[in-house]
C-alpha cells in the first residue's frame, strides 16, 4: 500500500492574512497525473492563515491516498478548527461513467456579518459563532463524447451553529450537472474551455423547498511565448426558502482572493477574474490578476455600485513531475487582503 502524507505547519500574522471559511476550499485533493511522487498526489489549496479568526495560531493538514484512489483529508488549526473527509473518483461501465463523491465533517469558530452587501460592508456587524458541518455529495457522470459530460447529482448537507441564538439546518439535494471540457491540462491549463452548469433542488422535509443554479465559464489561451491569459466567471443563484447557511458567498482561495469567504453573502453571487500567467525562468513563473464580484437578493436588487473589486499577484514554482506551487497575495475593498499557498492554479 502506497501512503502519501503531507504535514504542513504554518504561522500567522494577525489581521494580515486570508481567512478561508469553507473547508472544501482549504483542501481539495485530486490525482490528475500518472506520475507517482509525493506532491503529485496533492491538488488543492492550503492557506497560510487562521481559518476562522484573526488571532495568532498554527495548524496542520494532511492527505492520505489509498491504492483505490480514495483520498482521506484532514485539517487542524490551533483556533479549534477541525476537518476530516474523504474524496473519490472511480470509472465504471468500462469508463463510460465515473462516480465522484465527497464526504467531510468540519468544526470551526467563524464570523458572520449578516446577509447582503450593506451588512457585509459594515465592520461593526461582525459576530462570532461556532459552526459544525457534515456534507455528503455524489455524482454519476457519463462521457457523452466530444468533450461533453453529464449526469445526476445528489447531496445531503447538515449544519449546526452555536452563538447568535444557535440553530440547525439540513437539506437533501438532487439535480443534474453538465460540463464541456477541452482544457489541455486540468492542473494548470494553457488552452481550452471549461463550461459547467448545475441545477440542484433542496428539501429539508419541514419547510418549503429551495433551489440553486450554478454557471461556470473558464477560458485559457496562450497569448505569447510563455504567457497564458485565463478568464473565470462563476454565477450562483438561489431561490425559494433558502436558509442563510446555504447562501452563495464571495471570497476564498480560488476566487476573490483576499476576501474572507462568507463576509459577503446573499441569494445571488457573481464573480469574475482575468489572470495573466507568465513563465519567467527555468522553474519560476508569475501571475497577476484583476477581479470583481457582486451579491444581491430579494430585498436588495442588483446594484453595480455595490461591486467588490479585487486584484493581486503571485509567484509560481513548477516542480519535477509537473506539480505547480502557487504563492498568491490578493487584496480587495477597505484594505482586505490575504496570502494563499496553493498547489496548482486557482482555476
Where are the language model's segments positioned?
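Outer-membrane beta-barrel translocator/channel fold
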Residues: 75, 83-143, 231-253, 259-265, ...
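Outer-membrane beta-barrel domain signature
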Residues: 35, 47-51, 73-75, 123-129, ...
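Outer-membrane beta-barrel initiation region
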Residues: 21-102, 168-190, 266-270, 278-285, ...
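Cleavable N-terminal export/targeting peptides
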Residues: 1-32
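Transmembrane beta-barrel strands of outer-membrane/channel proteins
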Residues: 48-52, 62, 72-76, 88, ...
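Residues on the lipid-exposed face of transmembrane beta-strands in outer-membrane beta-barrel proteins
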Residues: 58-64, 86-90, 136-142, 154, ...
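C-terminal outer-membrane beta-barrel translocator/porin domains of Gram-negative envelope proteins
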Residues: 25, 174-281, 289, 296
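Transmembrane beta-strand segments of outer-membrane beta-barrel domains in Gram-negative
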Residues: 22, 38-42, 51, 100-223, ...
Amino acid at each position: 500500500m502506497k501512503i502519501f502524507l503531507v504535514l504542513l505547519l504554518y504561522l500567522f500574522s494577525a489581521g494580515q492574512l486570508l481567512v478561508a471559511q469553507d473547508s472544501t476550499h482549504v483542501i481539495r485533493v485530486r490525482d490528475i497525473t500518472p506520475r507517482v511522487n509525493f506532491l503529485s498526489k496533492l491538488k488543492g489549496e492550503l492557506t497560510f492563515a487562521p481559518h476562522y479568526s484573526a488571532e495568532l495560531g498554527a495548524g496542520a493538514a494532511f492527505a492520505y491516498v489509498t491504492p483505490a484512489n480514495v483520498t482521506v483529508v484532514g485539517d487542524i488549526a490551533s483556533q479549534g478548527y477541525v476537518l476530516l473527509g474523504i474524496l473519490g473518483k472511480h470509472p465504471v461501465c468500462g469508463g463510460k461513467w465515473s462516480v465522484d463523491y465527497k464526504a467531510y465533517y468540519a468544526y470551526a469558530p467563524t464570523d458572520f456579518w449578516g446577509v447582503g452587501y450593506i451588512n457585509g460592508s459594515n465592520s461593526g456587524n461582525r459576530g462570532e459563532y461556532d459552526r459544525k458541518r457534515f456534507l455528503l455529495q455524489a455524482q454519476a457522470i457519463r462521457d457523452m463524447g466530444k468533450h461533453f459530460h453529464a449526469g445526476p447529482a445528489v447531496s445531503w448537507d447538515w449544519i449546526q451553529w452555536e452563538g447568535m441564538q444557535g440553530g440547525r439546518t439540513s437539506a437533501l439535494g438532487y439535480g443534474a450537472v453538465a460540463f464541456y471540457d477541452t482544457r489541455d491540462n486540468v492542473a494548470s491549463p494553457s488552452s481550452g474551455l471549461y463550461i459547467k452548469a448545475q441545477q440542484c433542488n433542496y428539501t429539508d422535509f419541514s419547510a418549503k423547498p429551495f433551489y440553486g443554479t450554478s454557471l461556470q465559464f473558464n477560458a485559457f489561451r496562450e497569448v505569447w511565448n510563455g504567457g497564458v491569459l485565463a478568464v473565470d466567471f462563476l454565477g450562483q443563484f438561489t431561490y425559494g426558502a433558502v436558509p442563510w447557511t446555504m447562501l452563495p458567498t464571495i471570497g476564498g482561495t480560488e476566487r476573490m482572493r483576499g476576501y474572507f469567504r462568507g463576509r459577503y453573502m446573499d441569494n445571488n453571487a457573481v464573480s469574475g477574474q482575468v489572470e495573466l500567467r507568465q513563465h519567467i525562468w527555468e522553474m519560476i513563473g508569475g501571475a497577476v490578476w484583476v477581479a470583481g464580484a457582486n451579491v444581491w437578493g430579494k430585498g436588495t436588487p442588483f446594484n453595480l455600485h455595490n461591486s467588490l473589486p479585487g486584484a493581486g499577484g503571485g509567484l509560481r514554482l513548477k516542480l519535477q513531475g509537473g506539480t505547480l506551487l502557487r504563492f498568491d497575495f490578493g487584496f480587495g475593498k477597505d484594505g482586505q487582503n490575504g496570502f494563499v499557498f496553493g498547489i496548482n492554479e486557482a482555476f
